[in-house]
Amino acid sequence: EAVFLVTPSKAYCFTRTMIAPKMAPAASFMKIVDVDGGMVDGALAFIQDKKIKTVGFAPAKVNFVLGQQLTQAGLVSAGGLVDEMRMVKYEDEIARLKKSCQIASDAFKKVKPLIKTGMTEHAVACLIASQMIAGGADAIPFNIVCFGENTADAHHTPSKTRKLKNNEAVLMDFGCLYEGYSSDMTRS
């Protein structure tokens, strides 16, 4: 969805016109560059215009073939630099993370007493998703609800037919996206 470029003085995010407004709240520390053409082309034009001599890339964020192509094109592997930069959060980022977690937590508190024997996994998943959206979430990136034997499947898709039985284990793994920051909660 985006190409990021970090210089010694500023961070830039090159993204498509339709994505740029959505990224702005989550990227207050960088300049969003709205590109109508290709994101890579926009970043390359910027690099040439600013006469930037060395460009690094995050090898963990690209596949092997693309990494080889970037290296052959003269880019340098930046190792874990991007990950190190993202480890430290600004106050506004921390606030967004907390809000994302609060939305998910509040949704669980509302849904937990509603879970009853005979409900399907899908019905419970829909309840938790609707509560997160009602609570202010921008999107639901994942929402796993499983009962009984299905709790052993880490990537289970909630079933429309599997119903909760009496005294059966319930596992929920869910989270929401809020202004570019995701929460991730597991409850059983």
Regions found by a protein language model. Name each.
Residues 1-49, 102, 160-162:
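N-terminal accessory/capping or targeting/presequence segment of soluble
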Residues 6-7, 58, 146, 173:
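Short beta-strand segments
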Residues 82, 119-188:
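Short catalytic-site patches enriched in acidic/histidine residues
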